[in-house]
């Protein structure tokens, strides 16, 4: 496995409107577009920051992989639901890019209740020489127009414009936890705790309810939906995960309401490991189809698992993310960390998987060699071009000089959100209000 990841740290920068140290600046989602040229982050303040990859220059070959701010905009504002007397916070829960179909880029962003479709366009020319309007766009006095001229386009400084194209509201009673764009490029789905809705990208005033697990009596509720995703190639298939650790694969061709799943993926519980925390730590916090569409990756509190779509009985691979926390579940329950929702990601060839942990650590697992590594995203360890050193957490006994004791882990520093470039070994790591971009120098080790 290539461990030679070096970094570009996109820290808090003075003078940037999105970069003051407040809770609103905590990054809540990270997403590459389909080419990897753009990277979007959303934060708790309802803002979206888009980074663009710099073209490689002959003078500075190391600049490949550098991402700089491309555009910043306010996606959501705080609202108040007067019917339920509830505040709706502006925090961006998820961002999903639409496949690019013309010169413009489009993305979906959502908070707890409202999904918005945004269009991002570039302008580097402006029209001049209108017959009936002056340079400021005001209508001229027709008596002063004595000749006709052909308007021309003049070069201007590049301007990135972000405009809202659609607002999809009133589709969810509960908090939206995931959105996923279908491979048909016309529809997408959104999931909350109890329901999944199917939307058409061009229609905002109605959606189709495709999953509803709400019981007639809420006292009978035993599980909630935690994440959902469309299959990357088959537009009729989607999966959703639950707080009980199960995955349900659904086929929209079978029925309009997919309450009856096509396949149920569930690992039988080992009775010897049963404890008060068993159900909490088995809750799936993220599910991702592999790029090939053959596998699914899930993250629960202590592990990441790879499932084969053709085998429902158990995962084909299980990787321990931080098994040393198993003895600390009691204190993690008391400080609510046990409810943290970690995401997971595939690399472009589905051979390596990545997920976050505590103490600003993140983990990588090579599926072919079965090797794994723990790396750290922090200002100290991530000076530009510095090679990341593998970190090790030790539980009692002898300790090497660079090892960190499990008792000195900082649980306030957690990496929940990660993203992997769709084709190259470039990863984006959100560590509270800092974004780190790491790139593998060898760039072929993980392919």
Swiss-Prot record:
SMART domains named among the record's database cross-references: WD40
WD repeat windows: 22-61, 87-128, 171-209, 220-260, 279-317, 334-375, 410-446
Highest taxon of the lineage: Eukaryota
GO terms for MF: protein phosphatase regulator activity
Keyword Secreted appears in the UniProt entry: no
One GO location term (cellular component): protein phosphatase type 2A complex
Keywords: Repeat, WD repeat
Family the entry assigns: Belongs to the phosphatase 2A regulatory subunit B family.
Function: The B regulatory subunit might modulate substrate selectivity and catalytic activity, and might also direct the localization of the catalytic enzyme to a particular subcellular compartment.
PANTHER family reported for this sequence: PROTEIN PHOSPHATASE PP2A REGULATORY SUBUNIT B
The protein's assembly and partners: PP2A consists of a common heterodimeric core enzyme, composed of a 36 kDa catalytic subunit (subunit C) and a 65 kDa constant regulatory subunit (PR65 or subunit A), that associates with a variety of regulatory subunits. Proteins that associate with the core dimer include three families of regulatory subunits B (the R2/B/PR55/B55, R3/B''/PR72/PR130/PR59 and R5/B'/B56 families), the 48 kDa variable regulatory subunit, viral proteins, and cell signaling molecules. Interacts with IER5.
UniProt-recorded name of the protein: Serine/threonine-protein phosphatase 2A 55 kDa regulatory subunit B gamma isoform
Organism of origin: Macaca fascicularis (Crab-eating macaque)
């Amino acid at each position: 496995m290539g461990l030679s990841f070096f970094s570009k740290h996109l820290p808090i920068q003075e003078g940037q409107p999105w970069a003051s140290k407040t809770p609103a600046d905590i990054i809540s989602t990270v997403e590459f577009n389909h080419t990897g040229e753009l990277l979007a982050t959303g934060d708790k303040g309802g803002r979206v920051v888009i980074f663009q990859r710099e073209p490689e220059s002959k003078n500075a070959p190391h600049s490949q992989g550098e991402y700089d701010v491309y555009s910043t905009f306010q996606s959501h504002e705080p609202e108040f639901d007067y019917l339920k007397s509830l505040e709706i916070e502006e925090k961006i829960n998820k961002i999903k890019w639409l496949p690019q179909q013309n010169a413009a880029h489009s993305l979906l962003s959502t908070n707890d209740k409202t999904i918005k479709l945004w269009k991002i366009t570039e302008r580097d020319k402006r029209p001049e020489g209108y017959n009936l309007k002056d340079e400021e766009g005001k209508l001229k006095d027709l008596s002063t127009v004595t000749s006709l001229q052909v308007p021309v386009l003049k070069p201007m400084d590049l301007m990135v414009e972000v405009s809202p194209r659609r607002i999809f509201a009133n589709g969810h009673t509960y908090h939206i936890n995931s959105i996923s764009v279908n491979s048909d490029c016309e529809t997408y789905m959104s999931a909350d705790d109890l329901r999944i809705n199917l939307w058409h990208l061009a229609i905002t005033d109605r959606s189709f309810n495709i999953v509803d697990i709400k019981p007639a009596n809420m006292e009978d509720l035993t599980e909630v939906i935690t994440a959902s995703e469309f299959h990357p190639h088959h537009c009729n298939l989607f999966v959703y995960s639950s707080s009980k650790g199960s995955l349900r694969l659904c086929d929209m061709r079978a029925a309009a309401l997919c309450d009856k799943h096509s396949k149920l993926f569930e690992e039988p519980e080992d009775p010897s490991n049963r404890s008060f925390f068993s159900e909490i730590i088995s809750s799936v916090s993220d599910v991702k189809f592999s790029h090939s569409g053959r596998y699914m990756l899930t993250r629960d509190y202590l592990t990441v698992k790879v499932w084969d779509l053709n085998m429902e009985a158990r995962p084909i691979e299980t990787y321990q993310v931080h098994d040393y926390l198993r003895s600390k579940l009691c204190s993690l329950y008391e400080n609510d960390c046990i409810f943290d929702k970690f995401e997971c990601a595939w690399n472009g060839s589905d051979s390596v998987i990545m997920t976050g942990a505590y103490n600003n650590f993140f983990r990588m697992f090579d599926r072919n060699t079965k090797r794994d590594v723990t790396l750290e995203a922090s200002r100290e360890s991530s000076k530009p071009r510095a090679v990341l050193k593998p970190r090790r957490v030790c539980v009692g006994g002898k300790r090497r000089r660079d090892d960190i004791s499990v008792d000195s882990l900082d649980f306030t520093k957690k990496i929940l959100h990660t993203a992997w470039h769709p084709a190259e070994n470039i990863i984006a790591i959100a560590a509270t209000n800092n974004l780190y971009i790491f790139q593998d120098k060898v760039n072929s080790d993980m392919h």
